[in-house]
Amino acid sequence: MELKIGRAIIKHGLEDLYEYSDVDVAIVGAGPAGLTAARYLAERGFKVLVFERRFSFGGGIGPGGNMIPKIVVQEEALPILKDFKVRFKPAGDGLYTVDPAELIAKLAAGAIDAGAKILLGVHVDDVIFRGDPPRVAGLLWIWTPIQMSGMHVDPLYTQAKAVIDATGHDAEVVSVAARKVPELGLQLQGEKSAWSEVSEKLVVEHTGRVAPGLYVAGIAVCAVYGLPRMGPIFGGMLMSGRKVAEVVAKDLAEVAYAVRA
C-alpha cells in the first residue's frame, strides 16, 4: 500500500507541475484579491495558476479584525460576495460583516471550481523577462520550506503571458522586478498609514498593469503607489481582484487578436 500511495502522489503531482509550467496567468498570493482574480479569469477560459507561500488560503482574511472573527465589506462589493455565495450581515452606514472562515473557503472553492489551479507552499523567487524593451514573461519559484531553511536550491520556472502580484503589503513580485530588471521602470513608494475611505477607492482605481506582462492587485497596490492602508475592510481587495481580471483579460484578448492579424 505504501508504494502505491507514494507512486500515486509522485505521478499525479508531477503531472500537475508539468501541466502548469506554461499558463496564461500566474497569480502570486491566494488572498482576497488573488482568489477573486483567479475565479473571474478562469471563468473566461484562461489557464490560471495561483502561487501561495503558505499552506493555507486567505491572506489577511483569517485573523479578522485583531483576531475578532469578523471582517467588513462595503455595499459596492456585495455583487462579488453574491457571486461566491458568501453570506453577509448589515452593520449600518453601507457596511456589512462577513465570517472570515466562510469567505476564505468560498473564495478558494470558487476559484478552484472555475478551473484555477492553486499551488500551496511556494515561494516566488524571481521573474522571467524577455525583449527590449523588457516584459515580464513568467516566474521562478521554490518550495517555501527550502526558502525558509536558507539553503541554496535553484528554482523552477513557470511561463506566463501575464503575472499578477497579489502578495500583500510587500508587493514582493513588483519589488524583485524593480530591483533586478530596472529597465522596467518600476518603483515602490511604500504604503502610507490608514485612511480607509480614501484607500478603498484608490486601491481599485490604481489596480492594473504596472509593466508589460506584470499587474498588481490588492494591498500590493498601496505599496506600489504610496496609498494609505485600510485595515480589516475587504471590499476594496475583492473589487481590485475583479478589476485586475478584467484588465488582464482585455490585454490578453488584444494580444491574441494582434497575433491572429
From Swiss-Prot:
EC numbers for this chain: 2.4.2.59
Q: What reaction is this protein's catalytic activity?
A: hydrogen sulfide + glycine + NAD(+) = ADP-5-ethyl-4-methylthiazole-2-carboxylate + nicotinamide + 3 H2O + H(+)
Keyword annotations from UniProtKB, A to Z = Iron, Metal-binding, NAD, Thiamine biosynthesis, Transferase
**GO BP term (any one):** thiamine diphosphate biosynthetic process
Binding, glycine: 229
- Signal peptide interval: none
* Binding residues annotated for NAD(+), in chain numbering: 33, 52-53, 60, 124, 152-154, 219
Q: Which cofactor does it need?
A: Fe(2+)
In which pathway does this enzyme or protein participate? Cofactor biosynthesis; thiamine diphosphate biosynthesis
For molecular function, the Gene Ontology terms on record are: iron ion binding; pentosyltransferase activity
Q: Which residues bind Fe cation?
A: 154, 169
- The question of whether NAD is a record keyword is answered with yes
Q: Which domain of life is it from?
A: Archaea
Q: Is tRNA-binding among this UniProt entry's keywords?
A: no
Note the subunit structure.
Homooctamer; tetramer of dimers.
Q: What is the recorded function of this protein according to its Swiss-Prot or TrEMBL entry?
A: Involved in the biosynthesis of the thiazole moiety of thiamine. Catalyzes the conversion of NAD and glycine to adenosine diphosphate 5-(2-hydroxyethyl)-4-methylthiazole-2-carboxylate (ADT), an adenylated thiazole intermediate, using free sulfide as a source of sulfur.
PANTHER family, from UniProt?
Answer: THIAMINE THIAZOLE SYNTHASE
The family annotation for this protein states: Belongs to the THI4 family.
Q: What is this protein called?
A: Thiamine thiazole synthase
